[in-house]
């Protein structure tokens, strides 16, 4: 099964979770390892080495260089634009809803996630963004880049969950730097996992897919734990 490179695990799954860049990719790697059913996973990155290291079978290299985006969102955006046909092909397998998850602030997630969201929405897929905003100590430049990315993302999704890492840190006060990053990835995983499981675990909460569509369609921006207080 795992040797079947490039094939989604569940060929007929209508829900796809897409990790873009480092943070989003880590979140999707974690979810994949947890073995969530009825959902297919894809990791997208400009860094070919990071993709090779992912356990997820379906991987999409953005752009032709394979060297990462060096914290430059414009580079991430151009790489995604270069790979538009691949992005469309990845979404053309009967996907009806997707969760596009990314850490905002770096190059690939910030630049490429909004492009993938745009393609998804143009294809009529119910598109949900789940993104994190950096920690304050990561610096103003990164936070400004992240907020620009969130703004761009919000134009191309039906719903957007924004997870503020500083708020996260106040909740988990004993976190070291490394743990804080892991926890942010974990929160991305939990958010995507809980929404997808609400839809797919029949009998637990029998929420009809059309109900979800009605709730989320062009529902604007839903922000979890906002502000830099």
Briefly describe each language-model feature range.
Residues 1-229:
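Tubulin/FtsZ superfamily GTPase core signature
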């Amino acid at each position: 099964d795992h040797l079947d490179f490039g094939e989604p695990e569940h060929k007929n799954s209508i829900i796809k979770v897409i990790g873009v860049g480092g943070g989003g990719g880590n979140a999707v790697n974690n979810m994949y390892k947890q073995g969530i059913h009825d959902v297919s996973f894809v990791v997208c990155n400009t860094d070919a080495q990071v993709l090779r290291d992912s356990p997820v079978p379906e991987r999409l290299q953005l752009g032709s260089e394979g060297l990462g985006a060096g914290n430059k969102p414009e580079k991430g955006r151009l790489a995604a634009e270069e790979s538009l046909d691949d992005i469309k092909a990845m979404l053309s397998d009967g996907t009806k809803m997707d969760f596009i998850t990314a850490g905002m602030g770096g190059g690939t997630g910030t630049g490429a996630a909004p492009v993938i969201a745009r393609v998804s929405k143009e294809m009529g897929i119910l598109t949900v963004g789940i993104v994190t905003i950096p920690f304050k100590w990561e610096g103003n430049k990164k936070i400004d880049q992240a907020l620009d990315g969130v703004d761009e993302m919000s134009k191309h999704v039906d719903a957007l969950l924004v997870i503020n890492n500083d708020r996260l840190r106040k909740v988990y006060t004993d976190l070291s730097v490394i743990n804080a990053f892991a926890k942010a990835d974990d929160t991305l995983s939990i958010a995507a996992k809980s929404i997808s499981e609400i839809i797919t675990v029949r009998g637990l909460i029998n929420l009809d897919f059309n109900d979800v569509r009605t709730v989320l369609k062009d529902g604007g921006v839903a922000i979890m734990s906002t502000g830099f207080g």
